[in-house]
Amino acid sequence: MTDLKKTQLFSAFDENENVKHGLPFTAYTSNDFFELEARQLFAKNWTFVGFAHDLADVGDVIPVHVAEQPLFLVRSAENQIRAFHNVCRHRNLKLVDEPQNCKNRITCPYHNWVYNLDGQLCAAPFFGG
């Protein structure tokens, strides 16, 4: 990625990084600016990802993307909403494709690795023996 401080995207800021005026229109259409925001803003701060009522029941799970990262939200057995990377740690396969209720576990479709609703690996069939 180019050094964005040398581009028109940062013309809205003074040398102390204070906003001089509104952002240029390219801030809303530039892939470089989006990548910068994803890395420097969204990935480092609290980010809204959904509504609690969309995860009404224990085991409800919803796939989302934040800062170009695939995640999923799940309501745990303790009635807490948790967020996890949407990949199996075995072969990096996507765990959740669509909103659903997974009951009390999330199972990888590749080798059937099983995670509980707190993200802990519970079973790894055919692994290590």
What residues fall within each predicted segment?
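Short, contiguous pre-domain boundary segments
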Residues: 6-25
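A short linear-motif detector with a strong N-terminal bias
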Residues: 6-7, 25-29, 41-43, 50-52, ...
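Generic detector of well-ordered alpha-helical segments enriched in charged/polar residues
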Residues: 10-11, 34-38, 111
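Non-cleavable N-terminal signal-anchor transmembrane helices
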Residues: 20-22, 26-27, 39, 94
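Glycine/alanine-rich phosphate-binding loops at beta-alpha junctions
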Residues: 27-67
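Rieske [2Fe-2S] iron-sulfur-binding domain
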Residues: 55-129
